[in-house]
From Swiss-Prot:
One of its GO terms (biological process) is translation. Pfam families: Ribosomal_L19 (PF01245). This protein is located at the 30S-50S ribosomal subunit interface and may play a role in the structure and function of the aminoacyl-tRNA binding site. HAMAP family: Ribosomal_bL19. It comes from Stenotrophomonas maltophilia (strain K279a). One of its GO terms (cellular component) is cytosolic large ribosomal subunit. Belongs to the bacterial ribosomal protein bL19 family. GO terms for molecular function: structural constituent of ribosome. It comes from the Bacteria. This is Large ribosomal subunit protein bL19. PROSITE patterns: RIBOSOMAL_L19 (PS01015). Gene3D superfamilies: 2.30.30.790. Keywords: Ribonucleoprotein, Ribosomal protein.
C-alpha cells in the first residue's frame, strides 16, 4: 500500500474510534454489556468472564472473554470498537505472565483460577477516586 493510502486509512480509523473503554488485559475479569436485538426490542445482556486474549490492531482490535456456563467453557470474541458493546466494566485485575491464556481451556475447577493483582487493583481504585474529585 502506498504512503498516501496508508495515511487515508489511518485518518479514517482515527475518526471511527470514538469510544473509550477502560484499560484491561489478559487475566482480568470483565463484564461486557452487549446490546441484543430480539425481534423489535433491544435489551442489554451482561457477559462476565476472564479475558484470555487481546488483539490490538487499531479499528480491527478485539478481545476474547471466556466463562464457564453450566459446566461448559464458553468463549466469545468481541470487536473492541463494535456498536453492539454497550459498556465494559473491570471486576478484578488478574496477575498473569503469559500473553495469551489459551492454556485455561485445558484446566477446570480450582486449577483454572487466576491470582488477583492487588497492586493494579489499588492503583485503579486510586485513579477512580482522583477522577471523581
Amino acid at each position: 500500500m502506498s504512503k498516501l493510502n496508508k495515511s487515508i486509512v489511518a485518518e479514517f480509523e482515527s475518526a471511527q474510534i470514538t469510544r473509550e473503554l477502560p484499560k484491561f488485559s489478559q487475566g482480568d475479569t470483565v463484564v461486557v454489556n452487549v446490546k441484543v436485538k430480539e425481534g423489535s426490542r433491544e435489551r442489554v445482556q451482561a457477559y462476565e468472564g476472564v479475558v484470555i486474549a487481546t488483539k490490538n490492531a487499531g479499528l480491527n482490535s478485539s478481545f476474547t472473554v471466556r466463562k464457564i456456563s453450566h459446566g461448559y467453557g464458553v468463549e466469545r470474541v468481541f470487536q473492541t470498537h463494535s456498536a453492539i458493546i454497550d459498556s465494559v466494566e473491570v471486576k478484578r485485575r488478574g496477575k498473569v505472565r503469559a500473553g495469551k491464556l489459551y492454556y485455561l481451556r485445558g484446566l477446570e475447577g480450582k486449577a483454572a483460577r487466576i491470582k488477583e493483582d492487588l497492586a493494579a487493583a489499588a492503583a485503579a481504585k486510586a485513579a477512580r477516586l482522583a477522577e471523581k474529585a
